[in-house]
Every structure is written in C-alpha cells, then in structure tokens.
C-alpha cells in the first residue's frame, strides 16, 4: 500500500501571521531593535524590517548575531514619513495623503522601499491632475456646464490601483489668463504650462484617506520633475500645435489676431503690445528687437564689425554668412551679441522697455529648460520657405527668436534664465558666455 500525501494551502496564513507580528510589536514582545527618529523611539523586529527594506537588511546583516538589542538612528527621515512605512511593514497597508506624501516619499527612497516610493509618486501625479481639474471646473462651470459635467463623469477620484492616466481625450474647459499665470508661478518644475490636462483615473480600491485628499489643495513642492515631468501631456500638446497650424489658414479679425500672436510667441502667457500686427511681422520684430535696443540705449559707439554681424542675420540671400554666424562663438544668439557689444547695457530681464519679457522673468529665473519641447512645428505645405536660408526649427518660447541649431538655442536660453556661470576675477561681474568675459577682461588690461 502506497504512502498517501495531502497538501494543505492556506491563503490567509501570511496575512494572519503578519497581523500577529504586529500585535507582538504593539505589546513590546520579542522586539530586538530600537529605531530612533527625531528623538522618538520605535520598537520593532529585525526580521520584519530586513524582509521589507533593503536598507535595514544591509544595516542589520553585518551586525553581530549575539547582540540582543540594538539602537539605530535615522537622521534623514521624519516621524511623519517613517510611521506609515512601519505600519506598512506590519500590515501591508499604506495610508498617505497630500500632507504627509512628501515625507513618506523621502523616507521610502532613503530606506530603499522602491515599490512604496513608486506608489507615492503615482499618487502625487494623479492628485496634482485631479486638483488642477477641480479648480478648472469651479472656474469655468458657469461658462460651459455641459463640458464640465462630462468632465466630472470622466474622472471620479485622484487615485487608482494603477495610478495611470486615462488614454482618451476629454472635453477641455478654458480657464482665464489670471488662473493660468498663477498656476505657472506655483509649479517650479516647468517653465511652461499649457491649459490642457488629462483626466484622472477611476478608482478601483478607494480608501478614506484618498477621499479626504480630494478636497485638499496641493502644495507647490509636490510637483517633482520625476513624477510630473514638465506638467503637460505630450499628446494634448501635439493636438494644440495642430490647432494652431490650422488657424493660420483662416483670416481672423483683430481680436483673433491678438490671441493668435499671444499663443505663438509666448505660449498663451505673455502680453502682446500691438494686437493688430500679423504673426509674420511679429517674428521679424522679435528677431530685430535686440538690435534696436542696442542703437537706442548704448551710450558708447559700436564697432562696425560687430554691428554688421548682427545685421547680417536677417538679410535675405546670406545663407553662408548666417551659417558662419551660428557656428561662430561671437554670435550664438542675438541676446549674447548685445552683451558682448557693451558692458554697460543691462541684461534682457532687467530692461524696462521690453514688455514681452517683463512677465516671464519671474517664472523663468533659475530654471533648467527642457529644450526638446521647443522644437517648432514643421513648415506646412501652404507656407512659403524662408528667404533667409535653411529653416530654423528651434524657437525660443520667451522672445520668439529662431535658431538653426539646438546649441544656439541653449546658449540663448541662458539670457532669460539669469544664469551667468562666467565671472570676472577682478571686478566680480558675471557673464552668460565665455567670449563676453574674454572681451570684458580686455578692459582691465587696457586700463592697467
């Protein structure tokens, strides 16, 4: 007679054992490690912490086995961030909200609990999208109630088990200019914000903490670059570009021209001084703006070679000259040419006569720019090719100047950002380009 074998599998055994371990921890039994966070003591079991955290595993495995009690100080986490993670280790349930999400994410990253950190990042992303759309609904509910009702039906909660963005297009409610500008200022991860967002995902397993977070405002520090890159959706941004291209084929009125120029030059966030100017004229004026200011404000005379260099950029039929200027270190951008010409001329962000840059300097200061977003749309079949040589696809989103190479745009963007890495060792003056610093040092050599 053969041996009979019976296998019993209990699905709830692991959860039951974890619950009993949590009871032992709360009662203080068999706790062999003490964790000190901001002068607060937490008792726990080494085996539980080492099983759920690679950080604790590395710390505890190297210690002597005979040490019955050890004390571990965590200096880089807070009590607010550590407490939910300790509860998660013993209960497999994580409770976070918009108030403690930053501390929990920092503690999870420090303790190498990457699955929890990923969940916190997705919650932050969905919470930001949800709160932004709720503000839009309250702001535009009276103007377009039909679209807003459809919007409410499309998003029910800021969080889901997958925390992914719904892959469908929703009716978009327009918001006021004042609302857009305030949102741009409060979001430090992105220099540009468009007024289009995606819908929030549906809830599969909602919890009370998520429901409470629905009515709370999101702090500006929640918008991390790695969780909510640049604050815009690439799909809706491409649709916005297509709509702008299609509008160029129509003949609009004066108000339409003003809105179109504003969208094109400053991504719907800057003011246009002349609303009756066509879009092509504005491009030319923006390109020539720096040269006009140089002739008006510079007190000392400009050399003939430098003035001819800046004038040759917009002369038709000078393809070879223009290409040489783009490659030359003396003329990587229009703004940097002005800085090399005169040391007494203030930078673009401090010039009072340029109304186009006045509103953008506050939000573009000390910001790293995602240059890949500024690739202008390709020339459509209805537009004529540029008479100034090859097309310049790289456009500055602040002043509208176009460049042939991305390196020239990067150099030009330093002017708007206020970053001046090159400093004179004699007088302490800072410059955007190394060539400007070199020309400035010639002054000291001439004086000495």
UniProtKB/Swiss-Prot annotation:
Zinc finger intervals, C2H2-type: 394-416, 422-444
Biased composition (Low complexity): 299-313
UniProt xrefs under SUPFAM superfamilies: beta-beta-alpha zinc fingers (SSF57667), POZ domain (SSF54695)
Domain BTB: 31-98
Keywords attached to this entry: DNA-binding, Metal-binding, Nucleus, Repeat, Transcription, Transcription regulation, Zinc, Zinc-finger
Subcellular location: Nucleus
Entry GO terms, CC: nucleus
SMART domains recorded: BTB, ZnF_C2H2
InterPro entries (alphabetical): BTB/POZ_dom, SKP1/BTB/POZ_sf, Znf_C2H2_sf, Znf_C2H2_type, ZnFinger_BTB_dom_contain
One of the Pfam families matching this protein, by short name: BTB
Taxonomic superkingdom: Eukaryota
Transmembrane segments: none
Composition-biased stretches (Basic and acidic residues): 289-298
Chain intervals for the UniProt region annotation (Disordered): 289-320
Molecular functions per Gene Ontology: DNA binding; zinc ion binding
Protein name (Swiss-Prot/TrEMBL): Zinc finger and BTB domain-containing protein 44
């Amino acid at each position: 007679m053969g041996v009979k074998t019976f296998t019993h599998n209990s699905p709830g055994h692991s959860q039951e054992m974890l619950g009993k371990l949590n009871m032992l921890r709360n009662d203080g039994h068999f706790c062999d490690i003490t964790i000190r966070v901001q002068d607060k003591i937490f008792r726990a079991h080494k085996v539980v912490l080492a099983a759920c955290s690679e950080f604790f595993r590395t710390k505890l495995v190297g210690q002597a086995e005979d040490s019955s009690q050890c004390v571990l100080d965590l200096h880089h986490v807070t009590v607010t961030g550590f407490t939910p993670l300790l509860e998660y280790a013993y209960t497999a349930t994580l409770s976070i909200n918009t108030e403690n999400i930053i501390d929990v994410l920092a503690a999870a990253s420090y303790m190498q609990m990457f699955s929890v950190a990923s969940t916190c990042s997705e919650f932050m992303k969905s919470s930001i999208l949800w709160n932004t759309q709720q503000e839009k609904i309250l702001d535009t509910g009276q103007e377009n109630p039909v679209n807003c009702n459809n919007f409410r039906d499309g998003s029910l909660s800021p969080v889901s088990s997958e925390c992914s963005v719904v892959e469908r297009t929703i009716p978009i409610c327009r918001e006021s200019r004042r609302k857009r500008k305030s949102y741009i200022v409060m979001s430090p991860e992105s220099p540009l914000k468009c007024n289009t967002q995606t819908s929030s995902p549906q809830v599969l397993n909602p919890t009370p903490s998520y429901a409470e977070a629905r009515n709370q405002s999101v702090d500006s520090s929640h918008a991390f670059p790695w969780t909510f890159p640049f604050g815009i959706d690439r799909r809706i941004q491409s649709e916005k570009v297509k709509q702008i291209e299609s509008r160029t084929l129509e003949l609009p009125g004066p108000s339409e021209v003003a809105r179109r120029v504003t969208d094109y030059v400053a991504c719907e966030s800057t003011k246009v001084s002349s609303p009756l100017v066509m879009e092509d004229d504005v491009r030319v004026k923006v390109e020539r703006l720096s040269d006009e200011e140089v002739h008006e404000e510079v007190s000392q005379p400009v050399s003939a070679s430098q003035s001819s260099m800046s004038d040759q950029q917009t002369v038709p039929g000078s393809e070879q000259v223009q290409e040489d200027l783009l490659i030359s270190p003396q003329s990587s951008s229009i703004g940097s040419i002005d800085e090399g010409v005169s040391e007494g001329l203030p930078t673009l962000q401090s010039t009072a006569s340029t109304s186009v840059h006045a509103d953008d300097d506050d939000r573009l200061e000390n910001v790293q720019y995602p240059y890949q977003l500024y690739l202008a749309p390709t020339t459509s079949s209805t537009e004529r090719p540029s008479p100034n040589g090859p097309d310049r696809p790289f456009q500055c989103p602040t002043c509208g100047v176009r460049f042939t190479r991305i390196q020239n745009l990067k150099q030009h963007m330093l002017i708007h950002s206020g970053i001046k890495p090159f400093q004179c060792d004699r007088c302490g003056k800072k410059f955007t380009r190394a060539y400007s610093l070199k020309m400035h040092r010639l002054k000291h050599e001439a004086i000495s």
